[in-house]
């Protein structure tokens, strides 16, 4: 008998890793500019074009890379992501949670839902743990060089991927299965068995959906940056997150203890369903 699906979904920047990934893997070292200046240009471009800030940052990354003569191949982007800094304990987190879930009779899967660069995340050491990496992605030509944006995931776009997971229609390009009628009881990953870990404003719509549908939204903060803890506290106060913890993924941390509680609650829900 197949074990019931359970899902841990994560934002990346500020959730699994400190700061913005582009600031560690691209902007200061290769572009030779301050990250604040880069993001200021993104804002100006998005406003001037009345466009999306995710598309704006992706456009500027490619434009400035071409001006510098930087390599744009898929492999080069993944190499840039290989040394992304992660919060303490992240690399050991996934196997530990999987073992706990299995002991409870659950089949735990991990997903990324991020506005950051998919190619950078694919190059990180934790990439193999994810069922899918839903993140903004470049379009590549036949030479495998980035030529434009293939996928941009902004703060509201993130909610789409919750429903893809919920209905287990995982292909980004599939517009039919995701819109097909499917009763809640028939969905492979009900929201009650989904936890979402996120850190900021771009995660608010996702957290709202999670809260409204009985999921487990968790606000993550960087203990080294007090303003992020204040932001997490505000998410709790506003009813957007149900739980909050610092970005310490080591065994025995507050966040690890919350994961134990969440998995136990998911397992109790499965048992309750058996008697309905």
Predicted regions and their residues:
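Alpha-helical substrate-recognition element adjacent to the catalytic core
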Residues: 1-142, 241
């Amino acid at each position: 008998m197949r074990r019931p699906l359970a899902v841990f979904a994560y934002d990346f920047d500020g959730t699994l890793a400190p700061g913005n990934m582009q600031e560690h893997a691209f902007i200061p070292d290769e572009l030779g500019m301050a990250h604040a200046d880069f993001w200021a240009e993104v804002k100006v471009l998005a406003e001037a074009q009345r466009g999306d800030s995710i598309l704006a940052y992706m456009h500027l990354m490619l434009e400035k890379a071409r001006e510098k003569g930087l390599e744009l191949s898929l492999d080069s982007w993944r190499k840039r992501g290989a040394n992304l800094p992660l919060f303490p304990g992240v690399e050991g987190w996934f196997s530990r949670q999987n073992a706990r879930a299995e002991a409870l009779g659950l089949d735990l899967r991990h997903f990324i839902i991020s506005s950051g660069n998919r190619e950078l995340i694919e190059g990180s050491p934790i990439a193999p743990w994810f069922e899918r990496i839903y993140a903004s992605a470049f379009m590549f030509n036949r030479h495998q060089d980035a030529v434009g944006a293939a996928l941009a995931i902004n703060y509201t776009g993130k909610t789409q991927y919750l429903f893809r997971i919920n209905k287990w229609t995982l292909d980004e390009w599939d517009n039919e299965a995701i819109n097909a009628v499917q009763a809640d009881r028939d969905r492979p990953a009900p929201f009650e068995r989904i936890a979402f870990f996120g850190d900021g404003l771009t995660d608010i719509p996702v957290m709202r959906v999670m809260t409204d549908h009985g999921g487990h939204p968790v606000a993550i903060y960087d203990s080294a940056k007090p303003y992020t803890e204040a932001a997490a506290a505000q998410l709790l106060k506003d009813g957007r997150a149900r739980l909050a913890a610092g970005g310490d993924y080591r065994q025995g941390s507050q966040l690890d203890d919350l994961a134990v509680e969440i998995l136990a609650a998911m397992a109790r829900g499965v048992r309750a369903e058996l008697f309905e």
